[in-house]
Amino acid sequence: MPFANEGNDPIAARLSKCYWNLSSPFLKDVIPKKRPSKAFNRKPPTKLESEEEEYHKFERGLHISDLGPKLKETDGQPKLKFELADDYKSSKHCICMRSNTAYECERCHQYFYGRLAQICDLHPNEFFLMDFRNCPFCKAPIEMIKKSPISWETIRKIEEAELPSDGDL
């Protein structure tokens, strides 16, 4: 799957750290990079690391059930509620679960339905493999793809409409 922007895409950069030959036109040629096994390179822990590991074992031994009556004493206290004002607007919005939309390529004028790849402000490390990063027909960059002025239902009606010469077949 060749990338149109030659690796400038942050997703392509992240994937190139994990896979060899990402620019291959065949999926079977893209192979994961093998990381060296850490089992043979294990060094003995330093004094600080061993103390830290001992402390973590101690922490894991503590359970909330050991607190017993102390925890139940706080149940009688009223809980505080914080409500945001109606006019409050967050500066960051999650776009991960946005709906599919009809798009038109400005180069080949083909219509397609889906989502364009975008980076979410709240989840910058998440990406969706089915999002379009270029035109699926002519591989035009994402900058040349615009939202379609007509709905997907209308596009499907036009594409499935019977042409005047269809009766001749």
Swiss-Prot record:
The modification Phosphoserine is found at S165. Keywords: Phosphoprotein. This is Uncharacterized protein CG13380. It comes from Drosophila melanogaster (Fruit fly). The lineage of its organism: Eukaryota, Metazoa, Ecdysozoa, Arthropoda, Hexapoda.
